[in-house]
Amino acid sequence: YLNHTYPNTVMDFSRAVARADVPVVSHETGQFQVYPDYREMAKYTGVLYPYNMEVFRDRLARAGMSEQAEDFFLASGRWAAELYKADIEMDLRTEGLAGFQLLDLQDYPGQGSAYVGILDAFMDSKGLVSPERWKGFCNEVVPLLLTEKFCWTEGETLTARVKVAHYAARSLQGTGLAWTLRDEQGHVIGKGICPIVSSGRGLLEVGDIRQPIPVTGKARRLNLELAIEGTDYKNTYPLWFYPEDRSTKESHPGITVAKRLDGHVLSALENGGKVLWFPERDRYASQTVGGLFQTDDWNYRMFETISRNNRKPVSPGTMGLLTDPSHPLFRSFPTDFHTNWQWFPIVKQSYPLILDHFPKGYRPIVQVIDNIERNHKLGLIFELAVGKGKLLVCMSDLEAADDK
């Protein structure tokens, strides 16, 4: 559902669970793939040797992207941790679910090499998420935010429900769930307390949040923290707020927007013009891969083989985005260096271009991380000098993505 449903924190499995007459446990939750950390190879000092990692590292070197290995690892891993949070919370939001089970917290280096762990094969942390952050959404008590969306318009009133997944021994009755909305500098935008009146266990209804969002005229990320008073139980959520004026179609002097590089566009480039090009999806289908929002499941090699043998569609097989948040492109689009929820409509309408024949050192502005089998250099947004002009290429149908 994470790859196909507009990001929210209200979906759950309640309807399916209600139809079962036996306890239901969610099986192998997660399994979001992380690009391998080749520094782990030095840990193999005994009888085992990671020949598989050596092969994957050599493939990346042949593709001319060796120096990006750590960036691929961190960007895919940080995003995988957010996906685990979303998947686990969907289980916790489900009334009547008897529990959930991860295959493991660590990587599974067999069966095609499944680097799906938050821990490596030695049960050491990969440094992708702190224990405190993980405990915020995977614990005996978890405060939960229920909202229809992560992206809002300034001037709207932030509305959400709060619940608590409570399975600890002590009662929470008489305590309160404090919520605080802060900007990235830590300034408080709004706060409140919802009293916890239930003495029971399970999924507790707590209250509602209604917070008007002041208009600043700038896109920004805010962080909402939920904390149960007198305890260490707390959970956090990112939210994005954009100015009400979202017009993108007004004319920009000196910039040509095109879907085809025809004679007029090429002439503009030769004469020093600036062009924003949205290549037509069908026209370049053989030179692109599909848009995948989450990181690929388990490992690409195994499920590609299964899909082809059964004549089923093959996953795009990619592992999230890598970009530079300080790039001028993101002045009005706050972002991490990895994928996050605000990217969903853009990525879902994307068709990243294979740039394998570009110079080895060329790097897209927004790069899509490929899997360890193919190692394509994939561009979602990239720029080129053409003649005396500048060409910015966007491999996403932003008109189709503009749905919220």
How should these model regions be labeled?
Residues P195-S198, D232-T248:
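Short beta-strand elements
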Residues G155-V197, V206-P212, R220-E229:
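Beta-strand-rich binding/interaction modules
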Residues F32-V34, D107-A114, V188, H264, ...:
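Flexible loop/turn segments at secondary-structure boundaries
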Residues L103-A168:
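Aromatic-rich peripheral "rim/lid" segments of glycoside hydrolase catalytic domains that contact
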Residues L2-M11, R15, Y284, E304-D403:
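Catalytic beta-strand/loop cores that center a nucleophilic Ser/Cys/Thr
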Residues S76, E148-F150, Y167, S199-R201, ...:
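Outer-membrane beta-barrel proteins
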Residues H252-R301, K388, C394, K404:
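Short alpha-beta junction capping motif
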Residues Y1-D120:
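Substrate-binding/catalytic cleft of secreted carbohydrate-active enzymes
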